[in-house]
């Protein structure tokens, strides 16, 4: 299933163009999800390149991580591509539900989503120490409760 961010969207095309640009060498994406959205936009631009580059994509939901690994099984062995299960912040850094916009139309879903994030964070390790210190390009798309702290 194609992701919300894909090559048919302006953001997806911008990600593809940035990934195709050999001026940038190191990429980090937080929020792989199923690997078929922004991850695909990045890899569509990166995989044809014949220069040195590295791509790290993190997912904290084990189920979606497994979907991404299955989708990208043909490139999983590429040492430039690092699809990782983990997180870079801790549970206590997730934003409190009450600090999100009151008018958000999906607010009623927040308690469920927050609990899912907490459950996932208890299952996966903080792997920030395994990542390079600097990246040329970073996309933060981890979620409602984590993205500000990840920034």
Functional labels for PLM-detected ranges:
Residues 1-151:
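A short alpha-helical cap/connector motif
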